[in-house]
Amino acid sequence: MDETAEIERTWARHRRDYETYLKLERSMAGNSVAAYMHDFAHLERFAIEQHLEPEQITLRDLQLLLKHFSDLEIAPTSQRRMISGWRMFFHMLVIEDAIKDSPADLLDLPIRPKHLPDVLNDDEVTLIQQTFDRSTPEGERNYTIVEVLYGCGLRVSELVNLKLSNIYVDEQYLQVIGKGDKERWVPINERALELMLTYIHNVRSHVPVKPGEDKYVFLNRRGHRLSRQMVFIMLRDAVAAAGIKKTVSPHSLRHSFATELVENGADLRAVQEMLGHESISTTEIYTHLTRDTLRNTIAAYHPHYSKK
């Protein structure tokens, strides 16, 4: 039997097992599973090229593979995710008694960059919204999307997966399904709720909805659920039309939502709950932003700081 073919079959089997492990044991959402499986494909390809079974892979092998991606200038955040995925894969093999120890546990994580998305202020969000022609179905939809992202702090994946049944009008809450299919309840302000209901009743009701898509809130003109990429493109074009010289993505609106809350004295635990952060340390980054804002304000306006 051809050695390469046998190794390929072995890795194909592990690939199926790993995908099942991510879905069932780690309770990962579809987007996360796809990202980790993409990273796994790099490991699989490398191992097959080197004629390595999973149990033959060493720390040195993984370091060489990681160096390859570092030389390609793959972002540190992507490298960290790769390492995280490899660790989960080898951890699965340890559980299955296929290997004794994981070679990935000793990999050094690349330093996480401290770059954060640009923050938009309220006036800039208004400028973005003013670029939409609300007399058109797409314009009214896009205006509403920006309001919901900025007013509720949703991830773009949460927005496009939002269902009609997730809107609790009387309570003024959205039921949001976040990372790992974890549920949380996010307040929605009157303005955002009114815009959403107007869109649903006056715009969405006239869209020829495709089978299976009728449960989703935001649809394209052909009746399909909006994709994340469509929201990215819509916002990018609106920012350019508004003349805003910042790098803006849907995550920037979520980031701006959290920054506004923290800078205006919101309880950090409440912000953590609304954002769906597992760890308070993730939310604490916004307190660091607040300190930077204070420092910059003093530097700009206090006479002793502004002295040369």
Language-model features, listed with the residues they occupy:
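Conserved catalytic core of the tyrosine transesterase superfamily
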Residues: 1-308
